[in-house]
């Protein structure tokens, strides 16, 4: 916003954000927009019947016509459906030169990519997919980058977004929000082994997902395909839509929510040292259960919350015990 106000004074600024985008990202975007007159949040539908690239195409065309400034915040893979868009189509949608109503060239978008789920995938290098698009990539550090040892994350810009990085640095310092010396030390020591932790946690997750498919085939699971995993998208989080019953939508939803809590309460009571019930992408140990699977932050509208279970696994956990307890749950329903 600071950069836009300096380079394009008085122009409208649009933050394009999935309404169910996770946690603080969604919350902060809406709080900032509420404070500044020419800043507005535009919903980016990426879930259900909506597809990220198509939604971006539609919204960017509209914003270009208005001669406004587009900042897109998105997660790849998405939350909570763990989907990856067609990346070539995404690049094309972000690279298209658009025109304003008066025929001038519209301001190109900045793609702000939350890579917390898959920080191992390279998007920004000279030969990588988004090298030609103004892109910022950021990741929460609490799970993989720091090995669960601190909460500091990081943001990286490509060549096209270098000008924005200076402003980000300035604001981190203004807000006294830069990582501490100790956090830098932790990240420096942990990052070299990050990719191995990601792989180990993915293997546990794939194993657990396959087990659930076998033991409760009527459940709907959202996780990356084997093909996407082969491309490097190896998250360690999946969402679980439990089978429900009832004659009305309300009855089915109520029954499903009760089942969600039954499953989670069984897990945390049977495996108290590893299974945790909280809003988290997890740490380097144990297994984290979140409901609703979308943001629980106060600014997220109730209708955008998805009451399915989000499960986040780690590289070090007793997977066989989790399978055993899940089997108990299946037997009980």
Question: Model-found features: residue ranges?
Answer:
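Conserved PLP-enzyme active-site core in the AAT-like
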Residues: 2-213
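Active-site C-terminal subdomain of aminotransferase-like
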Residues: 136-304, 313-318, 325, 332-333
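Conserved beta-strand positions
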Residues: 74, 113, 240, 311-313
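Phosphate-/polyanion-interacting regions in eukaryotic proteins
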Residues: 1-20, 32-34, 87, 95-102, ...
């Amino acid at each position: 916003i600071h950069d836009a106000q300096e380079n394009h004074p008085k122009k409208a600024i649009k933050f394009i954000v999935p309404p169910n985008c996770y946690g603080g990202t969604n919350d902060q975007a809406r709080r900032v927009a509420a404070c500044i007159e020419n800043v507005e949040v535009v919903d980016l539908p990426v879930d259900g019947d909506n597809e990220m690239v198509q939604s971006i195409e539609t919204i960017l065309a509209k914003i270009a016509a208005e001669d406004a400034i587009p900042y897109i915040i998105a997660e790849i893979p998405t939350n909570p459906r763990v989907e990856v868009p067609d990346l070539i189509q995404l690049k094309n949608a972000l690279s298209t030169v658009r025109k304003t109503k008066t025929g001038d060239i519209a301001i190109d978008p900045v793609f702000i990519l939350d890579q917390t789920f898959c920080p191992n995938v390279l998007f920004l290098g000279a030969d990588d997919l988004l090298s030609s698009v103004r892109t910022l990539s950021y990741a929460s550090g609490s799970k993989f980058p720091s090995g669960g040892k601190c909460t500091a994350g990081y943001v990286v810009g490509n060549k096209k977004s270098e000008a924005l990085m200076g402003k980000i640095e300035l604001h981190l310092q203004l807000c006294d929000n830069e990582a501490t010396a100790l956090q830098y030390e932790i990240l420096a020591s942990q990052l070299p082994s990050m990719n191995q932790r990601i792989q180990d946690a993915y293997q546990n997750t794939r194993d657990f997902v396959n087990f659930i498919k076998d033991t409760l085939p009527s459940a709907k699971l959202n996780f990356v395909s084997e093909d996407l995993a082969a491309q490097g998208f190896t998250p360690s989080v999946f969402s679980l839509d439990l089978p429900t019953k009832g004659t009305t939508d309300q009855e089915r939803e109520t029954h499903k929510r009760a089942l969600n809590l039954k499953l989670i309460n069984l897990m945390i009571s049977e495996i108290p040292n590893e299974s945790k019930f909280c809003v988290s992408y997890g740490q380097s140990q144990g297994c984290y259960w979140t409901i609703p699977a979308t943001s629980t932050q106060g600014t997220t509208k109730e209708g955008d919350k998805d009451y399915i279970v989000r499960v986040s696994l780690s590289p070090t956990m007793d997977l066989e015990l989790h399978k055993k307890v899940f089997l108990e749950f299946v037997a009980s329903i």
